[in-house]
């Protein structure tokens, strides 16, 4: 049995024999004494192993195979290190190079590589300090999401990835089909999906919300956490075609309850990573985004400002800021507008509510003015919207009217209307995109670097 490098560094037993397994990050030598840094991914910093050829007999071939990227199993004595920047090192007694790495072709050498280059080798970029740190923080966030909801009486449910519904009504969906590409059309010139696998048109899910609402109508508080897909042709630093969503749905929750939950969740997650990922967060602060920790602490220590969409537009219109897209009532807020509100006006997170219904989803509850809906967007400095949600329409007739108004299919949504026919109740929910939250938490500027294998337009490695 061997220990992880993290365990050894956190619980050192000096002058004891230890065995570690990992990959060589760096190698240097001073005559007959060699120094290699080994990392196993359990922690940001690896551990230095000293190989003294004068004290031990090592196979010449094995010594030549000690190259950057090679995997190794090494045994030695854990001692205090006289070198600066490290507390411990291993005096090597023996080692075995498990997997060689040719230094002439291994793409990750001891230098800083650009993010653009690393995106071309997503299967290897995880071996860098930056992507290792991001991966550990992402893992911690995922764990803490489950912890938060479980502690607060929520039930975790799995919603379908293949669906016949467009949960957002936007039409930006990936079709799932087993039909041959040359299948003939029907008499109307359309593809006949009766012969398809499911006997109807099927898509990859854009949200688990609608199915989540069904379970909230019985379990009261649920959350989903899974992959979602958007066929949105957006080549930006904030959009991906495949991403993970956290979507809680709560029966008997009004909009204000929804806002309170969203704020509490964000603060819980940010506090957790600052407390439990301090080494990785310090690295990201130093090398990725100066002021990162202060930015996150500002969110944790702030009371989120809640304003209406109408008030937000008034603030934007009265400002002297020269926006690329001029704000006016009826336009969806752009990132530049959201950042102005959070960074220059309030200097803290802002929750914008009561959006015009004309650009919001069909399921949002319409306000008494019949012009706005009980929607909410949580905006944070530097990135803008990070959470989107609403109180859901619980009135059957109003929901039917809204579906017809938007020319959506009553037939496809009849099951969803059943939730209003039988024991309807006020209920709310929201969505938090994991990748965008990882972006914000780590300072990574491009969403392609916050997910292991990004899927974006014209980009599908592996």
UniProtKB/Swiss-Prot annotation:
Catalytic activity entry: tRNA(Asn) + L-asparagine + ATP = L-asparaginyl-tRNA(Asn) + AMP + diphosphate + H(+)
Matching SUPFAM superfamilies: Class II aaRS and biotin synthetases, Nucleic acid-binding proteins
Subcellular location: Cytoplasm
Subunit structure: Homodimer.
Keywords attached to this entry: Aminoacyl-tRNA synthetase, ATP-binding, Cytoplasm, Ligase, Nucleotide-binding, Protein biosynthesis
Protein name: Asparagine--tRNA ligase
Cited HAMAP family: Asn_tRNA_synth (MF_00534)
EC number: 6.1.1.22
GO MF, one annotated term: asparagine-tRNA ligase activity
